[in-house]
Amino acid sequence: MFVNAAITSTAQREFRSTAAAQRLSLDFLHEYVLGNYRDLYAATLALDVNQLNAAMVVTNLLRTAREASREQRAREGRLIAARLRTLPPQRVYGVFRDLRRLGINNRRTRAIVRDWVAARPDPAFDAVKYRRSLSVAARHAHLPLPGEVGTALFAWRRPRRYETPILEAWRRAHYDQRALYELPYTVAEGLAAQHGIDRARFLSGIAPRLTAGERLRLQGSAVRHKVDGVAMDLATAPLTRLASYALSLPRPERLRRRDELTGALRAAARRAARRQAGTWGRVVAVLDDSYSAAGSGTKRRRPLAVALATHYLLEALAADFTGLWLHHRGDPLLVHPVGATGLGMRILDALERGPDRLVIVSDGWDNDPPGQAAEVLRIWRTRLDPDQHTSIVHLNPVYDADTFDVRRLADGVATVGVRDAEDAAALVELARFATGRAGFDELRRHLADRVERFLDDQEAVS
């Protein structure tokens, strides 16, 4: 339950629940698992939980350190340090701001902050891009800052000139428009507004410094302002992000760029499949393109993007693949959310093909008619395939705030949360724990093994 929530929920509005309901449900679940299963709670840092929940786990473990034994604190410290190394800087600085707000400033916390900041490859870059966050961390943990970084944070007007190039560019950018194009996009954007620079001109100038994520977010703005230099690099984009981008395009443009987009999606799927490509045998997928797959205004088309990305990933993993959408027929690139969620008949269509694996990607709200999918799966499991020759897994990309879990289709069918399709192969490994057939002791052993592998991998590269 908790792992499913920690993978899928970002405490944002979903199709059927508000952001407030998502946050309240998630906060309660964190507190419950932390209070009753602390070791398992800490072990989730070694799993593929999303960034928000990893940050919440780190904060909660440090906030309640007095409740842990010395052995627990030592293990948690290693897990926290290892997980912070995998998170993007803005998320880690967010954790540090929360620690300051909560007044958590013990020696262990200061050491974790100090070690993470000391390991940053370019403190001067952080002093520009994450200026306020780094200053908060430095004050809170009493950090010694190298060279001109401390001056730039706390007395930036004093020097007439900085020796560090990025700090000097940042200083000059306050009065020289040309200098702001040497800065990170998020910093340069605010200074460009102060200088009154035209948006199209700014995007053209800053394009070479954009990260892959920034390029993706700016696609719409670049089209509106007719800027060509912000094109997204499809050859390196992650699979789910690429699917989201494809679905954001109008259908006529998807049709016009069909070969380019399909080729990029298949290449990304092969990268995600790696050595498992072609090893899954005969696979059939039932993919939800009902209206609820449109997501929310905050997570626009996210469930549909996960389904589309999973289609291409399973195509790469399988020796023989068939993808069955609830409503759409034809090229999956042209799919769009429409209609009710009638899973039952499509599951029947899938099972008739006799697959080795059946993968269902849906939010689980089977409503056309309600409960048909559960009945189909029950009869299949109990009467037609009691020996389970066909493996059935339900991947659900939407957290249900009311049940503190992702919504399940049927008893005895593994349901696991999924955020990025790239993680689907690893999530199938966790599916046996979702049905209840694997015991609690086996779960503990599995998590202990994952923790050791995670720590060994992270400490080997640190």
List each model region and its residues.
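Long lumenal/extracellular ectodomains of secretory and single-pass membrane proteins
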Residues: 1-285, 292-296, 324-462
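…and closely analogous acidic/polar surface helices at protein-protein or active-site interfaces
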Residues: 280-281, 293-321
